[in-house]
């Protein structure tokens, strides 16, 4: 069995794990990334992810502070405005950044983010990557935490669990988790359309569920957007599995969005994902902390899932930086509890907000239609309230 030693053992080599490793490497920690799949060496697999990530303005500021935005910005399509249209209550809202010449956020392909991070991580001398290493057991004592896979033993000061919704670390350590299954699936489509999107993001609320359209970069001379549509599993499966898939999807979507973007000219990709949310009872264990989807996931209705995970990373980096400067012990119970206190309630609040928003906008009861219409009118006319919502969406 091979033995490895490091200060930080990051379990999970997807987007959150890679970003955490890069940021921690800037603080000169010795790091090991372990990943059960061969995502990093097999870049073809990494770039096959057709999904997009919405990066809020506040998240962009953090990425700038880490020296990362300079590599990402060429792939990022800005969001200038957001239009919210509730089809059940026939109400509309229009949001823009109150600061002149500023954006609300950016849309970037996951594959581009991963590509950039892998390229930068390969240049780091204080990062080692172990692939094909699924964690099978974990033991800890007062000063170290040991993790074991089939062929490796890794000794570290702290484990950072970034291994997603179905975290193996969480399961092994026995951290309790609350799960919410929405009995919905998300239909994720990248498509080309006739008219320019003018950097406007749309959020439609239908009785069946929300539909978001996000502006993407032009591909050559083709206008392109990403669509995320939450619907019941039967409808999503029927749309995604039909033999005349692209033609059928095009017909359905043209009915809903043609007046905004013109006709759909081509469907680039179609993917489906079951919708669920979860939150851990706590975001730490003995010498281990959970970040991103290993700690929490939320309904995509507000497009804030990845930004919430990035706030975990930001909080953890501030603590690691402080520990480096004061020479305090990382991974101690005091350290891990302090991280939990910084991140848990922020995540719990957003978990509850997105869950309630989903319920409100899916509910077709008459009194709720009235409440939604009234709420939309109040927000549209109240500049202060509108700006507060914009700041929340931007993560500032």
Per-segment meaning from a language model:
Residues 207-273:
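Conserved FAD/dinucleotide-binding core of flavoprotein oxidoreductases
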Residues 47-74:
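N-terminal glycine-rich dinucleotide-binding loop that anchors FAD/FMN and/or NAD(P) in oxidoreductases
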Residues 3-4, 61-65, 75-172, 180-185:
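Conserved N-terminal helical subregion
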Residues 9-11, 25-51:
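Glycine-rich FAD pyrophosphate-binding loop
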Residues 1-16, 32:
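Beta1/beta-strand and adjacent pyrophosphate-binding region of the FAD-binding site
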Residues 58, 166-201, 231-235:
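Central beta-strand plus flanking loop segment that forms part of the substrate or channel wall
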Residues 318-396:
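C-terminal helical "tail/cap" subdomain of flavin- and related membrane-associated enzymes
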Residues 282-301:
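Short FAD-binding loop at a beta-strand-to-alpha-helix junction that anchors the flavin cofactor
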């Amino acid at each position: 069995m091979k033995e490895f030693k490091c200060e930080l053992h990051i379990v999970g080599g997807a987007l959150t794990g890679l970003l955490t490793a890069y940021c921690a490497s800037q603080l000169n920690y010795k790091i090991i990334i372990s990943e059960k799949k061969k995502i990093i060496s097999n870049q073809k697999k990494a770039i096959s992810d057709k999904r997009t990530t919405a990066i809020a303005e506040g998240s962009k500021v953090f990425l700038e502070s880490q020296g990362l935005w300079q590599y990402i910005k060429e792939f990022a399509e800005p969001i200038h405005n957001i239009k919210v249209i509730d089809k059940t209550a026939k109400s509309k809202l229009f949001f823009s950044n109150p600061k002149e010449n500023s954006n609300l956020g950016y849309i970037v392909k996951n594959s581009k983010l991963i590509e950039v991070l892998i390229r930068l991580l390969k240049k780091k001398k204080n990062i080692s990557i172990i692939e094909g290493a699924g964690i099978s057991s974990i033991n800890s004592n007062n000063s170290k935490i040991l993790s074991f896979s089939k062929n490796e033993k890794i000794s570290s000061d702290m484990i950072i669990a970034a291994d997603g919704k179905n975290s193996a670390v969480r399961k092994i350590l026995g951290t309790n988790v609350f799960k919410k299954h929405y009995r919905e699936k998300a239909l994720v489509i990248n498509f080309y359309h006739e008219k320019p999107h003018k950097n406007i993001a749309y959020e439609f609320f239908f009785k069946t569920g929300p539909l978001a359209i996000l502006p993407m970069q032009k591909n050559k001379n083709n206008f392109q957007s990403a669509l995320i549509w939450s619907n019941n599993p039967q409808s999503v499966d029927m749309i995604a599995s039909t033999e005349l898939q692209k033609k059928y999807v095009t017909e359905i979507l043209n009915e809903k969005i043609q007046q905004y973007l013109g006709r759909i000219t081509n469907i680039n990709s179609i993917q489906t994902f079951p919708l669920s949310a979860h939150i851990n009872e706590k975001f730490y264990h003995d010498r281990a902390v959970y970040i991103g989807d290993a700690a929490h996931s939320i309904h995509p209705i507000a497009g804030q899932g990845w930004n919430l995970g990035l706030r975990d990373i930001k909080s953890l980096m501030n603590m690691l930086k402080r520990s480096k400067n004061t020479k305090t012990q990382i991974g101690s119970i005091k350290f891990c509890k302090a991280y939990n206190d910084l991140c848990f309630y922020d995540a719990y609040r957003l978990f509850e907000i997105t869950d309630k928003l989903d319920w409100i906008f899916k509910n077709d009861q008459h009194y709720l239609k009235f409440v939604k219409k009234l709420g939309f009118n109040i927000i549209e006319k109240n500049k202060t309230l509108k700006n507060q919502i914009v700041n929340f969406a931007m993560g500032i």
